[in-house]
Amino acid sequence: MERAHSGAEVELWAEDEARLGLKPVIRRVWAPVGKRPVARFKRGYKWTYLYGFVRPESGEVYWLILPTVNVELFSMALREFAKEVGAGKDKHVLLVVDQAGWHTGKEVEIPEGIHLEFLPSGSPELQPAERLWVLTNEGVANGIFEEIEEIEEALMERCVELLDQTDNIRDLTNYHWWPQAA
């Protein structure tokens, strides 16, 4: 890609989506010896989706909370991401994604400067962005939420916290085999 766009800045990012909802994220909790811990929750089946973009080399992240996943919203997420990172004629981003239907459809609108690279089917272990969810779920773990908007608010707060944790994110997502800048 650097040869094809000589003189342009090139960055390598990864993107994935996670579904969160009123069905709770349960985590272990501390309890006194001999006492059974109790994690209260309310079960529900409304969902929201967190789109996570990560640059493993630096630990930079970009987040979007959207109501669903589909080609139209993925195209919108790509546009917003391209604006955020300044992708265009002079800056190109190779974005690693899985082969979800909304990533591969012919209707996907890919902004100038964004280039999609698809992982092999059924290989989430190769996706650095997949490792983000353990961090984002901390904001909603063991929480009791009445409405999906409460989860979105908690997610938003957690994502803002993570913006300053680039070292932690880099350590979690920058696989030893992930290409590095020369």
Predicted regions and their residues:
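RNase H-like polynucleotidyl transferase catalytic core
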Residues: 35-43, 112-131
